[in-house]
Every structure is written in structure tokens, then in C-alpha cells.
């Protein structure tokens, strides 16, 4: 399916270079996955720094800026995310959204527990609760990519998404 629009000569060249569809798919999405890991790591580091400074209230209140940053990031890696979200069936990434959310939920649970223990957060969240909220959140964020919306429209929708997901209220900052 990935090579559908190519002529036979190009298909042969593709399959010579890659051991199969899975290897080709992996090569196409690898830069996106690496960029995601870098972004997640940087965001996590920033959040813990703000937690240590007791600045989570201002971070949570300024949610629109990082949300637009995430949306911009998705569009910088648009092709990779389209593959992961719309064309990964039959690959090890067929459950990308669920796997991404599960990892994010584990990280968020540790963060939420730390914030609660330090009395920065007044709400003790449970793991399944975080998982459900993050599933909804990331599903909404990925929707513009899945539906091929223009970047400008997706950035515009960030205002509504930010209102819907009031992290300050969810975490009790």
C-alpha cells in the first residue's frame, strides 16, 4: 500500500533497499519517533524544574502556548504522524496512540504523585483516571492530523482544546 503510486521500477528499488514493508515503514517513521522522544524528555525535564520551583500554577495557567507548540511540532513531523495514526495497521505501531498514551500516563502518574507528595497538587489522581484523561487529550490533539486539517486551523482549535482540558483544575495546582 505504501508503494501503491510508484511505478514497478521504483517499487523494485524500494524493496531492494528495505527487507520488507515493516523495514520501510520503520525507516519512514523513525525520525518522527526520535523527535517525539526528545520532545517528551525535554517537556518532562521542564515540568520537573517548574515543580521544584513551585511554579506549576503558572505553567498550567499558560497552557495555550505549549499546546500550540505541540501542535506545531505535529505539523513539523506531519508525514510521520500521518503514517503512525492512519497507516500503521499491520505494523508494530498499529496501536501507536494507545502505546503513546500508556507511556505518557505512567510518566504523568509519577509526576502527579510527586506533586501531590510535595503538596503542590491538592488532588490525588489515580492511574486509570490519568489514562482516560490523556487518551481523550491526545486523541483530540491528533485529530487535525488524522483529518488532514491545515496547520492554521489546528492552531486555531488549540484555544478550544485548552479550555476543555483545564490542567490546573485537573491536577489541583
Where are these regions (language model features)?
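Single conserved hydrophobic/aromatic residue that forms the stacking wall/gate
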Residues: 1-10
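Alpha-helical structural segments
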Residues: 16, 23-47, 61, 65-69, ...
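Short hydrophobic/aromatic patch on the recognition helix
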Residues: 10-18
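Amphipathic alpha-helical packing segments from all-alpha helical-bundle domains
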Residues: 61, 69-76, 90-117, 128-135
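C-terminal/domain-terminus segments
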Residues: 84-101, 156-169
